[in-house]
Swiss-Prot record:
This is tRNA(Ile)-lysidine synthase. Ligates lysine onto the cytidine present at position 34 of the AUA codon-specific tRNA(Ile) that contains the anticodon CAU, in an ATP-dependent manner. Cytidine is converted to lysidine, thus changing the amino acid specificity of the tRNA from methionine to isoleucine. Its EC number is 6.3.4.19. It is found in: Cytoplasm. The lineage of its organism: Bacteria, Pseudomonadati, Campylobacterota, Epsilonproteobacteria, Campylobacterales.
Length: 321
C-alpha cells in the first residue's frame, strides 16, 4: 500500500495536518506518512461517546510526543439531535480553525473507497446532483488550504489486511456498529458487501466519474478575489464554491441557491451581480459610512456584500464583477 506520487509531491512541499482518531484508517495513514518521511502534525476531536474516548486521546498524545509532533485536541459538546451532521460541522470547523491559525497548507483525511461509496449511496438516497454524489476527491481545494485523501481508492479490506500485516496498533470504534446512524445503516446493509466483491470495478468507475465531473463542471470557473469566491450563476458551481468555504449544502438549501441573495447556514453569504455568484463569509457592520454606502450604490454592490467589503477594506474599483 502506497501514497500516490502526485499526493506525495504536494505533501513534501507544504505544511501538513493529519485528522487523527487512532482508529484503523487514520492509524494506517499515520504509518504511511511516517514511512514516506512526510512532516505532519495531528488534530483530534474527542466526542466522549465511547468508553475508550479518553484513553484514545491519551494514547494519541503519547504518540505525538514519541514522534515529536504537535497535536491539537478539542472536546465536543453533547449533541442532542442530528449527531452525524452536527459532529461533522463541529469537526470541520475546528480543523479549519487550526489550519488557518497555524498556517497548514494541507488537511489530510483518512477517507477510503468504502467511505466514498457510502457517501455516494447516502446522497443518492436523498436526491442529489453529480457534484454532491461525487462529493469526495483526492485533492480538494478550500479557500485557504487543501484537503488531501490519500486512501480514497483503497478499500477497507485492503486497509484491514495492511494493519494485520504491519501489526499496527489502533482502537476499534464500536460506534460504527450502531445502525441508528444513517451511514452505519448504509454500510452494514448495502455498501460493505458490494465493495468487498466489486472493489476493482468500483475504483475504475469512480475514477471515470471524477473525470466526467471535471468536464461537466469546469471548477476553474471559480475565481478567488480577496476572499470572495466568484463563479457563473450555475447551481453546481455555486454549491462547490460554498463547499470550498466549508459548508456542505442540504437538498433544501440547494433549492434556494438561485432564488436570490441569501445567508446559508448562518455563516456563508451568497450574492449575485451581473449573472455572477459571489460567495463569502457572512459579516455585519454596525454602521457603514455614508460615502461608502453611496459608492456601493453607484457600483450596484449587493447589500449583503457591503459589510464584508468595508470590514476587509476592499477597494470597490478593484472588483471585476
Amino acid at each position: 500500500m502506497q501514497i500516490k506520487d502526485e499526493i506525495l509531491s504536494l505533501l513534501k512541499r507544504g505544511k501538513n495536518l493529519l485528522a487523527f482518531s487512532y482508529g484503523s484508517d487514520s492509524s494506517v495513514l499515520f504509518y504511511l506518512l511516517m514511512q514516506e518521511k512526510i512532516d505532519f502534525d495531528l488534530v483530534m476531536i474527542n466526542y466522549k461517546t465511547r468508553k475508550n474516548s479518553d484513553l484514545e486521546e491519551l494514547k494519541a498524545k503519547e504518540l505525538a510526543l514519541k514522534f515529536h509532533k504537535k497535536i491539537f485536541i478539542k472536546h465536543a459538546p453533547k449533541f442532542q439531535s442530528n449527531f452525524e451532521k452536527k459532529a461533522r460541522d463541529f469537526r470541520y470547523d475546528f480543523f479549519e480553525k487550526i489550519c488557518l491559525e497555524q498556517g497548514y497548507d494541507h488537511l489530510i483525511l483518512a477517507h477510503h473507497l468504502n467511505d466514498q461509496f457510502e457517501w455516494f449511496l447516502m446522497q443518492l438516497s436523498r436526491g442529489a446532483g453529480l457534484a454532491e454524489i461525487l462529493g469526495m476527491q483526492e485533492c480538494e481545494k478550500r479557500s485557504n488550504y487543501t484537503l488531501l485523501r490519500p486512501l480514497l481508492f483503497i478499500s477497507k479490506d485492503e486497509i484491514s489486511s495492511f494493519l494485520k500485516e504491519k501489526d499496527i496498533f489502533y482502537f476499534h470504534d464500536e460506534s460504527n456498529e450502531n445502525e441508528k446512524y444513517f451511514r452505519n445503516y448504509i454500510r452494514k446493509n448495502f455498501s460493505n458487501a458490494f465493495v468487498s466483491e466489486f472493489h476493482q470495478g468500483l475504483k475504475r468507475s469512480f475514477s471515470y466519474l471524477d473525470e466526467d465531473r471535471k468536464k461537466l463542471y469546469d471548477f476553474e470557473n471559480i475565481k478567488e478575489i480577496q476572499g470572495l469566491l466568484i463563479c457563473p450563476k450555475n447551481e453546481s458551481l455555486i454549491a462547490r464554491a460554498v463547499k470550498m468555504k466549508g459548508l456542505l449544502l442540504s437538498t433544501a438549501q440547494r433549492k434556494e441557491l438561485l432564488k436570490g441573495d441569501c445567508v446559508l447556514g448562518g455563516k456563508i453569504a451568497l450574492a449575485y451581480k451581473n449573472e455572477q455568484a459571489i460567495v463569502f463569509e457572512y459579516e455585519t457592520c454596525q454602521k457603514l459610512p455614508k460615502n461608502f454606502k453611496e459608492e456601493c450604490r453607484i457600483a450596484k454592490i449587493p447589500r449583503l456584500l457591503r459589510a464584508y467589503l468595508y470590514n476587509h477594506k476592499i477597494d470597490i474599483s478593484s472588483l471585476s464583477f
